[in-house]
Amino acid sequence: TQIETQARTSFYRKWMPHVHVDYHEQGINSPYYFAPAAEPLHKVITPWQRKCQEHIGGFNATAFDIRGALYFTREIFDLFYPSYGDTWPMFHGAIGMTYEQGGSSRAGRSILTEIGDTLTLAYRIENHHATAIATISAAVHHKDQLLKEFSAYHRRNSEEPWGDYSAYLIPAEGNDEGKMVWLTEMLDKHGITYTTPRSAHKSVPALDYSTLLPTTVKPLKGDLLIDSRQPHSAILGVLFDPDPVLSDSLTYDITTWALPFAYGLKCYGLTSTTKSGGKFAYTIEKDEKKIESPYAWIVDYKTDEGTTILSQLMKTGDLVRVADTPFKSGGIEFDRGTLVITKRNNETLLDEIDEILDLADIEIAGLRVTRVNSGLSESGPDLGSEHFHFLKAPRVAVISGENVSSLSFGEVWHKFEQIYEYPVSVVKGMKRIDLDNYDVVVMPRGWYSLNETQMSELSSWVSEGGQLIAIGGACRSFADKEGWGLSRTGDEEDEMLREDEYDAHSKSDRFAPFALDTRMSVMDDIPGAVYKIGLDNTHPLAYGYGDSYLSIKT
């Protein structure tokens, strides 16, 4: 999603280097880090890539030993999650490495470390320069093997898939077409090719991503088919890896990331070859008999793009309603959450509405706009019924500040600004917010300290209709507090089970060797897991979804 990263990946793919170093800075008290990396390493990383990291590390060590500079290797920084400047190049056949120098923006021109040493900008530059020269020297020394192994890596991409599956199938039926298009855009940026199967295929053996169990599936024309035998087979196999194998439980980042989970798409890993039926292109049958002056426009709210359209309509001042009950109109069945824009109450905005929805109907995959010439439904409530609720454009505030996670804040802000294109107010800290000016307040993950007065004001505001969205750690401020209905524990039976588990852990912790302290401390951490969440899709928060959803917990 980041435009800077998109530019970097595009530039990288033009050059396809044999060696790639991602230069970073870490805390001021840490010595220099260079490869070889720590475990875990993803199984796609080859023996040569591992060995070459050792070769280059040896050259770097010699350069530092001569100067008496401190360094460490094989700790902290692993090669598992494919989003970094060392792993991503690795999965493109290069020797990818992270180099970390103590410093960061805090260090400035010089800073005193905890042991009383003065760390200067000049010394930090000297260290990075030393590893740069040593790395180039190592690459030159091993150039013949580098070229040979790089060529073999990419030859294997087209001849022998790196992942566990011959192909990946994203069925058109039951998937959000808009998200399928988002996925293909991601694949395009990685140079990964895809097609659609030939029609009338027989069922083939596969892995169902939703259960991680073997099954059979019948590929159909219109489905998205990604063959593993292609120039970027390795990165494809990693990005679609449903259950990555960990060689070490201590890892720098998340342990689950498969794109079908990230995009909320049904997916099957095929264990046999499936013939392509040509280029994949999502198409939807548009209404050829367009009603020029409709009674109402109906927007099928089953894709995230529907929220973007709703945002555009609200910014224009259009009056939009949402259905709380399924209905049938114009020969089409519509679910809860469907948006309805009637001519009545929008008389002065008809041209703007038509322009917005005409463009959306053409350009947005998975978004269906239906024009009807009557408010009389064939089944379910009529369009003038109280089952269609007016949607007020909310005034939204997003909390920022020192104690708010910049990553969580950025995620929320990006969603509103780049995806929904909806205006929000950024407020620095909960102390400065005037709740009367907002309908919705979003608290990203963070460490909030709310006093009794603030809690009372928030409670009154929520009671009067304000909507408070607390994410992750922000929920701690309201857990086990009277009137908020949020508990850290479950029912009595759940709590007893939790206490039994805690007692068992306490006993094992009590007698564990001190050397295992770090591992014991992360025993209950889940840095990457996929949860199947049951949804009540009669509730407005779940409109547009099915009865369950796969979500990645990071």
Residue ranges and their predicted role:
Residues 7, 11, 15-16, 29, ...:
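Intrinsic-disorder/low-complexity accessory segments
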Residues 1-2:
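Mobile, glycine- and charge-enriched loop segments
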Residues 22-26:
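Histidine-centered divalent metal-coordination motifs
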